[in-house]
Curated annotation (Swiss-Prot):
Entry annotated with the keyword Secreted: yes
Domain of life (superkingdom): Eukaryota
Subunit structure of this chain's protein: Heterodimer of an alpha and a beta chain.
Native source species: Trichopodus trichopterus (Three spot gourami)
Glycosylation sites: N27
Protein's name according to its UniProt entry: Gonadotropin subunit beta-1
GO cellular component entries: cytoplasm; extracellular space
GO biological process, one term: ovulation
Length: 118
């Protein structure tokens, strides 16, 4: 029986080879418009889920620390051909689950759609 369960787990893991749920770097592209020219920028972002377990409620000031997928960011500049105005865009260098900083990040519940594979 254990062999059947292990085979099933390995088969499912193989099916979702491209799926990653943990915090990781992901390549994306998005369009930018400058000088009437539209061009796609290719960059990396942090994506994925961080483990969180709600503890037993004790009081108003005893909330669990929320972890989010974030990392070190830099900014790069791209010049679109035929346009003197440069485009600055963020690039994630690494990602990890860190404490949510409400000063620069929304730490509430995400009400949008979360795809099964990012």
């Amino acid at each position: 029986m254990q062999l059947v369960v292990m085979a099933a787990v390995l088969a499912v893991a193989g099916v979702g080879q491209g799926c990653r749920f943990g915090c990781h770097l992901t390549n994306i592209s998005f369009p930018v418009d400058s000088c009437g020219i539209t061009e796609f920028i290719y960059t990396t972002i942090c994506a994925g889920h961080c483990y969180h377990e709600d503890p037993v409620y004790i009081g108003h000031d005893d909330w669990a620390e929320q972890k989010i997928c974030n990392g070190d960011w830099t900014y790069e500049v791209k010049h679109l051909q035929g346009c003197p105005v440069a485009v600055t865009y963020p690039v994630a260098r690494n990602c990890e689950c860190t404490a949510c900083n409400a000063g620069n990040t929304y730490c509430g519940h995400f009400h949008g759609y979360i795809p099964s594979c990012l």
